């Protein structure tokens, strides 16, 4: 292993060097910061950025090494501060400066402290006085500590260094576009592309040999789907490419691999084969009226009735997905190939996210088409925002999700920062609420996921009885991937899942597209039919 130790003219750098030797049996190459060359960086398997005097702004090379890391990076004290500031954190005079003092087993030498940690970084340790002691990047192999692990008075420094130097993750910067990156995995049986095609977040392209239920993950985590009926189909990721919102990208693996890109397939339109609704117009209207009968009897408040469209699919699903992601950019777009089933999703809806024990759900209930002019567009958005029926639908699901998160939340932590806000997407306006909570200590990410699954926006309320009624009305036909969830879960417990809507599922040359809506006592059956036509417009009129 080749370890580069960047020396910021500190008096403890060679203590760090000998800690590396104790941890890995190799001495690092120690290079003064101003003498570091691209060759030094590119030849290193691990990079350590030492402590030093002053502030990170006085070291102009700091941001680049952290934003575009050629190998896993560990920042110590000044290096840690530089890592955090590279991603937008604030560095201030510490409320509790420490020089040669030991707290919680950590020797501290610092007058400054990091505050306002950005979402891209995850805090992993705080001192008892509230000072941030350690953090890591959520996607990149970058971490750091404010304290000095090399100090003779620090405990745990050797374990920290062994963990950092352990050969469990391979990283290499790559250049190109996500459309090119997906070709790396063109011949793989199991592929996932979690695609923030609207540019709002990170994208993940990955593969792995094993597909199964959620379990203790590899260092690269698991990516996959949960069907509405609860079947878990997750790839145990062994190779991946991670793309930042700025377009910077890195290949990662549980072992080294050589990314080989080819020209992506040309975009292909949706096949113009005949479309067939599982429940035709009269049948669907009759089922809506039956929903309202159940509601009138007091069995439910809201029933999320679904339908589906099927059609022959004599086209390359990936080529069609490339067209869909351009025409309908979405924060939760996704392409998956799982043992012969291909999923093409342009979902706009977050089901559940967990970051640092902070849970967030964003159910969608209420839809209007985008207008043909700016004036009409504003009128449609205003109509949605003031609709008694749509707000009632959304409120019921919001209260349902408050209940679901309450099963695993710290008492009193469930909040609704946004109730019935209008969010606009490429083809529709949506009514969206945001529910947050703090995960109860002792509860796991899987506990949270299962407490809220299936997403209330696809069931109605009360959930248990509504699902029984829907199973009867939908004639015991499995929804499958539609109405389920797509997302990832990391070994550290971060997760993010979307609701599977606006999604084509292709198997054996036949495509299905689920669609539906929430039925309440205020629903007009014909208007509900028109709403599913609006939601299905990209499929019915490609």
Annotate each language-model stretch with its function.
Residues 2-6, 10-76, 80-81, 87:
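Flexible gly/pro-rich beta->alpha loop and the following alpha-helix that scaffold active-site loops
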Residues 17, 59-62, 157-158, 317, ...:
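Conserved strand-to-helix beginnings and helix N-cap segments that scaffold or border functional pockets
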Residues 52, 140, 150, 308-309, ...:
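Flexible loop residues that form catalytic
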Residues 156-169:
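Extracellular ligand-binding/catalytic regions of CAZymes and related secreted enzymes
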Residues 63-76, 81-159:
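Pocket-forming structural segment of enzyme catalytic cores
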């Amino acid at each position: 292993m080749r370890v580069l130790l960047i020396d910021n003219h500190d008096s403890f750098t060679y203590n760090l060097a000998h800690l590396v030797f104790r941890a890995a049996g190799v001495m690092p190459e120690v290079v003064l910061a101003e003498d570091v060359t691209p060759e030094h960086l590119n030849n290193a398997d691990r990079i350590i950025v030492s402590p030093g005097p002053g502030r990170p702004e006085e070291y102009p090379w700091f941001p680049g090494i952290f934003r575009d890391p050629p190998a896993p990076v560990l920042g110590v004290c000044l290096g840690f501060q530089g890592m955090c500031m590279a991603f937008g954190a604030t560095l201030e005079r510490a409320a509790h400066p420490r020089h040669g003092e030991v707290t919680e087993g950590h020797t501290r030498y610092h007058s400054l402290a990091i505050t306002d940690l950005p979402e891209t970084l995850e805090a992993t340790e705080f001192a008892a006085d509230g000072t941030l002691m350690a953090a890591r990047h959520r996607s990149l192999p970058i971490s750091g500590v404010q304290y000095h692990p090399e100090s003779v008075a620090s405990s745990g420094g050797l374990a920290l260094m062994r963990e950092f130097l352990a050969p469990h993750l391979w990283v290499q910067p790559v250049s190109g576009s996500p459309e090119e990156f997906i070709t790396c995995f063109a011949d793989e049986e199991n592929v996932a592309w979690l695609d923030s095609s609207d540019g709002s977040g990170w994208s993940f392209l990955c593969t792995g040999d094993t597909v199964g239920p959620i379990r203790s993950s590899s260092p690269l985590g698991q990516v996959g789907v949960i069907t509405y009926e609860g079947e878990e189909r997750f790839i145990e990721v062994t190779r991946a490419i991670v793309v930042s919102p700025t377009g910077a990208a890195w290949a990662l693996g549980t072992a080294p691999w050589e990314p080989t890109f080819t020209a992506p397939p040309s975009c292909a339109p949706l096949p113009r084969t005949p479309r067939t609704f599982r429940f035709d117009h009269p049948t669907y209207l009759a089922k809506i009226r039956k929903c309202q009968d159940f509601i009138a009897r007091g069995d439910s408040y809201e029933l999320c009735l679904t339908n589906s469209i099927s059609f022959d699919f004599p086209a390359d699903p990936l080529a069609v997905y490339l067209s869909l992601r351009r025409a309908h950019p979405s924060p939760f777009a996704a392409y998956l190939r799982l043992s012969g089933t291909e999923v093409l999703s342009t979902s706009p809806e977050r089901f559940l996210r967990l970051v640092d024990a902070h849970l967030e759900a964003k159910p969608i209930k209420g839809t209007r088409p985008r207008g043909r002019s700016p004036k009409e567009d504003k009128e449609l958005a205003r109509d949605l925002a003031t609709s008694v029926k749509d707000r009632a639908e959304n409120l019921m699901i919001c209260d349902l999700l408050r209940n679901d998160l309450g099963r695993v939340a710290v008492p009193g932590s469930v909040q609704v920062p946004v109730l019935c806000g209008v969010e606009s997407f490429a083809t529709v306006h949506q009514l969206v609420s945001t529910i947050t909570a703090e995960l109860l200590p002792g509860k796991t990410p899987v506990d949270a996921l299962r407490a809220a699954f299936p997403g209330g926006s696809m069931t109605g309320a009360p959930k248990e009885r509504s699902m029984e009624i829907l199973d009867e009305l939908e004639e015991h036909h499995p929804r499958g991937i539609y109405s389920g969830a797509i997302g990832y879960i990391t070994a550290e417990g971060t997760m993010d899942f979307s609701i599977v809507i606006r999604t084509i599922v292709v198997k054996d040359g036949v495509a299905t597209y689920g669609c539906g809506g929430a039925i309440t006592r205020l629903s007009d059956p014909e208007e509900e039919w028109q709403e599913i036509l609006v939601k299905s417009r990209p499929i019915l009129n490609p």
